[in-house]
Structure formats: C-alpha cells, structure tokens
C-alpha cells in the first residue's frame, strides 16, 4: 500500500509531516479572510502572538498548532473503486420514501439540505440511498454527529447495512484509515480537507455543534468543492432556519414516525422540594409513587436528572428505595458509559438514571421516561423534545409513559410540548 494512502483528504500542520512528506503535499495558506484560522475560522488574537510576530490559533490547538507564518498541507482525495455497497433490504414507508427520493435528487443536484424529521422517524434508513448513490460511483461519504454515543451506534448499524470498509473516528478511537464511508464526531471534521462528496451531520442541534461557527467551518472544509452538505435534526436551530429562509438550504420535513403512530406528548407533574429531600437522602413522595407505579408494568425506566452531582445522589437514594431493581447511572464523566447503556438495553439494568448525555441518538425499545426537575435551566426546549423522543419508538410499543416532573413550568417545557403537538398535527393526527 502507498505509504501516503491514509493522508488523502486530510489537512496537516507543518510538523505533523516529515520534510519528505511535505514535498509531496499541496499547501494552503493558514490564514483565511482578514485574519482568521483556515482550519477552524477563529480570529487570531493579539494575546496569541509569538516572539517572531506571527500568531497561532488557540481554538484548534489540540489538533496541532496553526501559525500565520506557516502553510497548511493537504493531499488531494482520490476516488475509491466503484462498489454496489448497500446490503440493507428493508422497505421505507411512503413518508420516508419521499424524503429519501428528495435527498437522492438533492445530492445529484449538489443542493445543500436540511432534513427536519421527528424523533423515531427512521432518519438513518432515509439516508441510505443517497449515501449508496455516491459510494457506488467511487465517492466518499462522511456521517458526523456531535456525540460519541451516537457515532458508535451509527457505526454498528452501517457495518450491517453496507459492504464497504467503514472507519470510526472520535477522541478515543483507533487511528484513521482511508475508507469510502466514515463515521466521525463533528470535531474530527477539522482534520479533513475537500475529502467528501457528501457530509451528513446528524443531530445538528446537539452540543457542541449547535450553531458553533468552528464546526460549521469544519463541515465546509471537509466537503469537496462540488460536494454537498446535509443536516439532519428533529429540532432545528435559529442558524439553520435562517439558512432555509435565505435559500442556502432546502428543507425536507417528516412529521411522522416510521410506525405511523403519533409522538407521545409529555404529561406535566408538579412537585416541590426535590433538592431538600435529596439532602435528607429521601425521594419526594409524589415522585416515589410514580416510579413505584411504573415498576409494576415491568417496562424499562429511563430517568433524566439535570446535573451530575444530583444524579449520583439520586442513584444512591433510588438503590435504597428500590433494592429489588438493578440501577445504573451515566453522565459525560462515566468511564464505562457504553457498557452501562448496553446493560440497560439488554435488560440487565432495569432503571437507568442519566444526565442529558442520553437525550438523543439512542433507542431503548419499550422504555418509559421520567424527567426530574424538567424546569431546570439546563433543559432547553430542544433537549426536552429529544428526551421525549426516547418514548414510543418501537413498533411493538409505540406508546409509553412520559412524565415531566417540574417545580413550576418554564418556557422550554411549554415550547417542547407545543412543538410535539404541532408535529402530530402536521402528520395528520388531531
């Protein structure tokens, strides 16, 4: 294999390459616009001035230092061999087919697109034909998402549904190898340059992507000059809505789930003194009763808490109150998060307590959801819509329990409920 095989479509700083490799590479200025970093688009700051009067970019420093007095290096992407790559033999609903056809047509026309589809609509399958249409011709495609958990789940599904090699890229993944299909966290896009014929960004409204100019820049750099960007979301953002209005993005909407049933609408439940009870190692009686009643059904229970510290305390109290249950807790700081999530999916864990880390991109068949302190400022309307979307996703149980325990309703709660009802209305449910 050519020693530079895995360099094609990648962007490098000077000292990430040997002098021999630099001679074989093409170069691009490290400065774009008036005074911004080519790689991430951030302005060079006076405080990041070097002794020789050059500047460096602090925003993307972890990927190698970009300096104004040094070029950036890249190796142009090469075509892959043509391949009939789609193994998936499933069928789409009429609603899904409409979106799939629209995507294929827009990719053909190189029309940037926003797919606004409700949670549980089957977005992944709707992308397949557009993805395959390019890989079949020797093209390269990247599916990116802000969350590692989402990327890993997507990677597993794609391995079953496509015959080509696939690489998975995130902060803790194996080194990159060049493949026609790449699954990556959105930050990893900063390492590519004109590499992909199609970049699909899933869960585009999620932290840290939501309206983050660095990651929009990364997506623009990663796609080829004649390539196309597609954004997928269940809850749009102000920036994306602006792009739709200005004609930069064409919007394709799907307000209906794949199984044809309406979205589950959250029920608000008022309660008080959650923090006070927590300090006394107790559960608010109203919350305890609701959990007790839910456990009688035997369905798995996912409980969201707004903060890690509260989640840890809450998990301990839950174990004391429900000793017969197997209880897990996950947050962004949980090292074995993936194993715990898998344990919940396999029903080894019966109650899973989580921060917003599991608000999106994961499916647990038949799950019920309780949001504790839904009024907390960390719960945006977008995250509450996503959390609600965990319920009723499976054909076997398209309904479920969805409770927002709050200490006074908020604009985010009301907006989330209104949005869910509006989607049901658009789908023809009264």
Task: Locate predicted features.
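Conserved RecA-like helicase motor core of SF1/SF2 enzymes
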Residues: 203-206, 340-341, 345-398, 406-411
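Walker A/P-loop
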Residues: 108-132
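Conserved helicase motor
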Residues: 145-153, 157, 167-177, 184-191, ...
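Interdomain "pre-motor" coupling segment immediately N-terminal to P-loop NTPase/helicase cores
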Residues: 30-79
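Conserved segment of the helicase C-terminal RecA-like domain
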Residues: 225-239, 388-419
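N-terminal pre-P-loop "Q-motif" helix
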Residues: 88-111
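Conserved interdomain linker/interface between the two RecA-like ATPase lobes of SF2 helicase motors
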Residues: 248-311, 315, 327
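Post-DEXD/H (motif II) to motif III coupling segment of the RecA-like Helicase ATP-binding lobe
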Residues: 196-270
């Amino acid at each position: 294999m050519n020693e530079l095989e895995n360099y094609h479509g990648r962007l490098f700083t000077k000292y990430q390459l040997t002098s021999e490799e630099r001679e074989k590479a093409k170069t691009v200025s490290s400065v774009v616009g008036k005074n911004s970093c080519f790689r991430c688009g951030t302005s060079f700051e006076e405080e990041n001035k070097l002794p020789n009067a050059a500047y460096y970019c602090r925003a993307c420093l972890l990927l190698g230092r970009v300096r104004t007095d040094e070029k950036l290096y890249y190796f142009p992407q090469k075509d892959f061999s043509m391949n009939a790559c789609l193994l998936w033999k499933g069928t789409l609903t009429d609603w899904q087919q409409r979106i799939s056809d629209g995507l294929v047509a827009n990719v053909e026309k190189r029309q940037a697109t926003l797919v606004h589809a409700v949670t549980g609509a089957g977005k992944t399958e709707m992308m397949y034909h557009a993805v395959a249409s390019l890989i079949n011709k020797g093209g390269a495609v990247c599916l990116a998402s802000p969350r590692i958990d989402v990327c890993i789940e997507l990677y597993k599904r794609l391995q079953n549904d496509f015959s080509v090699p696939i690489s998975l890229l995130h902060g803790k993944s194996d080194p990159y190898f060049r493949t026609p299909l790449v699954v990556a966290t959105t930050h990893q896009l900063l390492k590519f340059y004109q590499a992909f014929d199609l970049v699909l960004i899933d869960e585009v409204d999620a932290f840290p992507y939501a309206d983050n100019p660095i990651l929009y820049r990364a997506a623009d750099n990663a796609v080829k000059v004649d390539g196309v960007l597609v954004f997928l979301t269940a809850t749009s953002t102000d920036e994306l809505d602006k792009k739709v209005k200005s004609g930069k993005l064409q919007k394709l909407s799907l307000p209906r789930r794949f199984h044809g049933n309406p979205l589950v609408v959250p029920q608000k439940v008022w309660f008080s003194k959650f923090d006070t009870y927590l300090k006394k190692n107790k559960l608010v009686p109203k919350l305890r009763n609701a959990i007790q009643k839910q456990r009688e059904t035997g369905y798995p229970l996912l409980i969201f808490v707004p903060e890690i510290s509260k989640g840890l305390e809450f998990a301990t109290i839950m174990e004391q109150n429900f000793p017969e249950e197997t209880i897990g807790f996950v947050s962004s700081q949980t090292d074995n998060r993936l194993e715990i999530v898998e344990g919940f999916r396999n029903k080894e864990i019966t109650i899973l307590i989580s921060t917003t880390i599991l608000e999106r991109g994961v499916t647990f068949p038949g799950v019920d959801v309780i949001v504790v302190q839904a009024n907390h400022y960390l719960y945006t309307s977008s995250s509450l819509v996503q959390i609600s979307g965990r319920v009723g996703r499976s054909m076997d149980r398209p309904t479920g329990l969805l409770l927002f325990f709050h200490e006074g309703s908020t604009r985010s709660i009301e907006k989330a409920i209104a949005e869910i009802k509006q989607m049901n209305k658009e789908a023809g449910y009264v």
